[in-house]
Amino acid sequence: MRYSCPLPLYSVSIIAHLKHRQSLIKGLNNHLCQQHGNEIETSFADLGVSYSGLSGKTAADFGSGKPFITYLNVYSSNVIDETLYQYVQIGSKEKQNVVRYGDVLFTLSSETPEEVGIGSVYLGNQEVYLNSFCFGIHVTNTQKVFSPYISYYISTTQFRKFIYPFAQGSTRFNLCKSDFEKASFKLPSLENQKQIYESLKCFSDKVAVEETILKQYYSQKQYLLRQMFI
């Protein structure tokens, strides 16, 4: 007896649906930024205080200890994924910068200028550190910026165009951190930042739920396929 299984086609349909939703979120993010993004002029130097990642560490220090945020975690998500920490030994008298809620984190270098200064925002409350290939900004000026909104703003086309000129190099590109921090850019008003964030997060949460369902569906499909050939 031959078995027919429509699962792969359905799976492809779901993936296409999710990609479409993600594209819509990106487009909406850009549109709202263009519509409301000229209400506050500021800079990261005005918004907070910058700090470096881990220093003075050797390979022997990694693998256990305190959690730290990896380069890939910053690079791959607009909000730090708290399930992807790695670990490093931190001495009781050692001075290392701790990442705080609302901090904006950026990558310092990349092989292409387009990927320099990729950002992410930490929205957790755990004592956590930052890898040495990134830097962070403690946001202190909460009268001008709503940190959760920045997690969307830093992925807009407008912000990516703003950051490109600060990538310097030839074979490998590095972010000119001091110039980047002092450079002015424009944001929506604080109230609009909060409203835009709530709207975008609503869509993002729906996509996240659908991605979870897709993973569960894929596991179920694999189970059923195994049962067919027992």
For every predicted segment, state its role.
Residues 23, 27, 31-55, 182, ...:
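Non-catalytic DNA-recognition/assembly elements of restriction-modification systems
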Residues 70-71, 90-155:
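A short beta-sheet element
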